[in-house]
């Protein structure tokens, strides 16, 4: 299994911080466009949508780390935590934009909106599930929780599916963009289901080759 080529170990930490900086650029740029009146239509809705779509992208990127390693041998595991936390930060910004700028903190209207619109109910449920994952994304929690940590963090697949569904249900007509994200999440969830069988099949397939190499 090879890791990222031509990246010295001393650059692993700086590269993760660079990922955080790059990861926040869409939010900063979107806020700038909104503040200067350059977002089309309803600026609040557009900014809210931008944050939500980037949250979903970072969730998908987080889930894609393992299949990329399994299929192509490229180890990006060191970036998975950063990608997952970026997804959480974008979900929180998406949520706060909805609460503060869209609904202006009118709690009765917010509660009614959650109850009346299923896609918002699903989005809120995904946020609630995501919070414990973000809180436990650290070495101390991994050591403290042990195997329970792995079970807890499998919820990310449910969260990603809920996020894609939230996005698809938020529009009047499901278009190619919504279908793409639903498809990507479905593929990643399916990979999770077949991963062990695939790895077992690959090990069985490479075992005779290793035996022949030793015999030769």
UniProtKB/Swiss-Prot annotation:
Function text: Part of the MsrPQ system that repairs oxidized periplasmic proteins containing methionine sulfoxide residues (Met-O), using respiratory chain electrons. Thus protects these proteins from oxidative-stress damage caused by reactive species of oxygen and chlorine generated by the host defense mechanisms. MsrPQ is essential for the maintenance of envelope integrity under bleach stress, rescuing a wide series of structurally unrelated periplasmic proteins from methionine oxidation.
Subcellular location field: Cell inner membrane
GO biological process: protein repair
Subunit composition and interactions: Heterodimer of a catalytic subunit (MsrP) and a heme-binding subunit (MsrQ).
Protein's gene: msrQ
Protein name: Protein-methionine-sulfoxide reductase heme-binding subunit MsrQ
Species of provenance: Rhizobium meliloti (strain 1021) (Ensifer meliloti)
HAMAP family with a match to the protein in the record: MsrQ
Keywords assigned by UniProt, alphabetized: Cell inner membrane, Cell membrane, Electron transport, Flavoprotein, FMN, Heme, Iron, Membrane, Metal-binding, Transmembrane, Transmembrane helix, Transport
A single cellular component GO annotation: plasma membrane
Bilayer-crossing regions: 16-36, 48-68, 82-102, 119-139, 155-175
Cofactor dependence: FMN; heme b
InterPro entries (alphabetical): Fe3_Rdtase_TM_dom, MsrQ-like
Cofactor note text: Binds 1 FMN per subunit.
Record membrane topology: Multi-pass membrane protein
Stated family: Belongs to the MsrQ family.
Domain of life: Bacteria
Main location: membrane
């Amino acid at each position: 299994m090879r890791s990222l080529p031509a990246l010295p170990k001393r650059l692993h930490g700086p590269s993760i911080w660079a990922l955080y900086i790059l990861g926040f650029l869409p939010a900063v740029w979107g806020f700038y466009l909104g503040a200067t009146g350059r977002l089309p239509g309803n600026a609040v809705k557009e900014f809210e949508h931008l944050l939500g779509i980037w949250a979903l992208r970072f969730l998908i990127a987080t889930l894609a780390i393992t299949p990329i390693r399994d299929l192509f041998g490229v180890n990006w595991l060191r970036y998975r935590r950063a990608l997952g936390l970026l997804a959480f930060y974008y979900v929180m910004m998406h949520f706060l934009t909805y609460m503060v700028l869209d609904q202006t903190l009118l709690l009765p209207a917010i509660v009614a909106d959650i109850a009346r619109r299923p896609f918002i109910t699903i989005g809120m449920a995904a946020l609630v599930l995501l919070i414990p994952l973000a809180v436990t994304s650290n070495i101390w929690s991994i050591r403290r929780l042990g195997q329970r940590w792995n079970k807890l963090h499998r919820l990310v697949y449910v969260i990603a599916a809920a996020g894609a569904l939230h996005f698809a249900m938020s529009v009047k007509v499901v278009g190619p963009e919504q279908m793409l994200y639903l498809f990507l999440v479905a593929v990643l969830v399916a990979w999770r289901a077949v991963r062990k069988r695939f790895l077992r099949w690959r090990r069985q397939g490479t075992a005779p080759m290793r035996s022949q190499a030793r015999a030769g």
